[in-house]
Amino acid sequence: MMNHQSMQNGKQGPLEGIKIVEYGVFHAGPGGSAILGDLGAEIIKIESGFGDPERYWTKIADLDMSTPNGESIMHEVSNRNKKGIHLDIKTEQGKTILHRLVEDADVFLTNLRKNTKQKLGIDYESLKKINPRIIHANVSGFGPEGPMDNLGALTPLDRLFPA
């Protein structure tokens, strides 16, 4: 389990007592919850498979993006203030653990695509059955509804499709 250092340094913030379960990749989702952690929220990051792909971004073109110990600076920045768990939510055991985490969470934050969330059972409709008061925060490239609602996006793409 990862446990990145908090920017709070032991100080309480306005979100102290708020529990956020995050299942996100790259920066959009994880970066948002890192800021909420700066404000005192407890963040539990779920990773599956090989982990968040941002873990492996140690070089972009000729730019070295690694820490002195070889880890991704981007991943470190996006995942400060978090506890982490590796969980395969496609298995019954993984689903059971996920449900336990969501039962008493205040927020579930994700940036996965719509069909992926539905397939994994982490869409709002599925999670509200486990915790009716859950806030389902979703970061998406093209919004929750519309002709491109199931497309993923990285920052360069959003410059092509202004709001």
Regions found by a protein language model. Give the residues of each.
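N-terminal helix-loop segment corresponding to the beta1-alpha1 unit
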Residues: 1-163
